[in-house]
């Protein structure tokens, strides 16, 4: 019984037959029964498979990589009560974004349907704020109003067990308050609210204008 309890503290499992190696997040037996949906292999940043167990260990299980897999690339979805670990293409994309941001370079990530866009967006927005001290706010900008509630609920479900706050903006006034409150945080808002704030609400020379103008912000769109 004690041995079974010990496994309750494990967040990531690795299985291998030496020639093929996979990893997956700790899950209930019923979830694991679905098999391939929860088990994934590793690929390098050029998308070449890393199958050999020693090569996998060098790429994923060394320090600090193993720590980062848990601290930076694991999500506890509070709504679904499920532990999730990002897939390698998501991790490589976020790492590339972080490296580019440190050099003040913009970029984009290609995503297909069902590839985990929301979770990638959450972790990218979250990690930029956590890893780069000079960034005061990260803003996840949505281009359609109908996605606002959906994205906000997903982000807040991920953040419930995280070390970061996610604030939504129900209107332009709320957006201005979030931007001027002095807290380091992630903000979820729409392009329409941001445009309205810039074009109609902010007036040059006011305290709000000066504070927002001088903010160091990273946008994830």
Regions found by a protein language model. Name each.
Residues 207-221:
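SF2 helicase catalytic motif II
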Residues 197-201:
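Conserved ATPase-coupling elements of RecA-like P-loop NTPase cores
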Residues 171-187, 210-211:
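Conserved motor-coupling elements within RecA-like helicase/translocase cores
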Residues 145, 166-177, 190-196:
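Conserved helicase motor
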Residues 2-3, 192-195, 218:
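Conserved RecA-like P-loop NTPase helicase motor core
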Residues 1-137, 146, 150-161, 182-185:
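ATP-dependent helicase/translocase motor core
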Residues 16-17, 142, 221:
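Short beta-strand/turn micro-motifs composed of small residues
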Residues 140, 187-189, 219:
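Hydrophobic positions in the central parallel beta-sheet of the AAA+
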């Amino acid at each position: 019984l004690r041995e079974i309890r010990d496994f309750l503290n494990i967040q990531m499992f690795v299985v291998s037959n030496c020639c093929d190696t996979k990893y997956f997040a700790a899950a209930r037996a019923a979830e694991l029964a679905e098999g391939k949906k929860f088990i994934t292999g590793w690929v390098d940043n050029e998308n070449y498979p890393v199958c050999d167990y020693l090569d996998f260990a060098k790429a994923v299980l060394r320090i600090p990589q193993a720590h980062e897999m848990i601290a930076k690339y694991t999500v506890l979805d509070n709504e679904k009560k499920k532990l999730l670990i990002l897939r390698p293409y998501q991790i490589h994309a976020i790492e590339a974004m972080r490296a580019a941001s440190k050099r003040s370079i913009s970029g984009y990530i290609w995503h297909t349907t069902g590839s985990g866009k929301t979770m990638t967006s959450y972790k990218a927005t979250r990690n930029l704020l956590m890893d780069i001290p000079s960034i005061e706010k990260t803003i996840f900008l949505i281009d359609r109003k109908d996605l606002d509630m959906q994205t906000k609920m997903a982000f807040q479900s991920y953040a419930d067990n995280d070390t970061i706050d996610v604030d939504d903006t129900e209107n332009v006034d709320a957006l201005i308050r979030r931007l001027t409150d002095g807290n380091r945080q992630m903000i979820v808002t729409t392009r329409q609210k941001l445009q309205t704030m810039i074009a109609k609400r902010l007036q040059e020379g006011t305290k709000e204008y000066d504070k927002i103008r001088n903010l160091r912000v990273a946008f994830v769109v």
